[in-house]
Amino acid sequence: MAGLREKQKAQRRALIEKAASELFVEKGFADTTIEEIAARAVVSAPTVYNYYGTKGDLLLALVARGEEGIEEALPNFSQQAANHAPIDLVAKVIRSNVNDTLSALSRELWGHVVAFVATSPDPEVAPRYLSTIAGGLGAAIEAVLKAYQARGQIDSALDAHELAFLLTRMERIHFLNYVYLKAMTVDELHAAIARDVAIIVGPYVREG
């Protein structure tokens, strides 16, 4: 019975998040109400409040959904070190995360996310957002860098943690460019990130 309840709860969450993502794009985050989200998801408004607390928390839950793929793939990425050059694999990790992110939230919806985080009076919103978008990706890049250090292909003196999170900040700048510059394509986004990965990681690569 407990398993059935959890399954039903997950199904309701999926319906709520789908409804919210559609309405945020159609009407804008500020003009969408919890009641409208509930009506489209065919649940009660108290259910939405119970699951997410606030509309802002629901928006951040959508962001977190886009980061699930990188967390699940983390062990696999480290194992790929034997078959990829360091720069190529780091770029692949970031590319995978970008694709997962855009599968979960459209470019238009990301515009609402950025605006919400920038204007929220809640001082905890921005740290939560940054931790969500950087945590899984940073951990995946760090694991890959350490795998290459163990293989002698990345300078052992490198602080893998610091470089990994520098790379997440670089990725975020390019991603924001993609959100703002409507003429920019996903392929151009990936190419820009790959160029910077080569510049940043290249000096630390060693012959294994």
Where are these regions (language model features)?
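Helix-turn-helix
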Residues: 15, 19-57, 61, 65
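Hydrophobic alpha-helical connector segments
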Residues: 61, 75-107, 160-167, 190-193
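Amphipathic, non-transmembrane alpha-helical scaffold segments
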Residues: 9, 17, 59, 63, ...
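N-terminal intrinsically disordered/low-complexity leader segments
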Residues: 1-11, 78, 208
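Helix-loop "lid/cap" segments that line or gate small-molecule binding pockets
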Residues: 79, 94-102, 111-120, 199-205
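Hydrophobic/aromatic residues within well-ordered alpha-helical segments
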Residues: 12, 55, 62, 66, ...
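Hydrophobic/aromatic-rich alpha-helical bundle segments in the mid-to-C-terminal region
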Residues: 108, 127, 131, 149-197
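Amphipathic alpha-helical packing segments from all-alpha helical-bundle domains
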Residues: 71, 84, 88, 104, ...
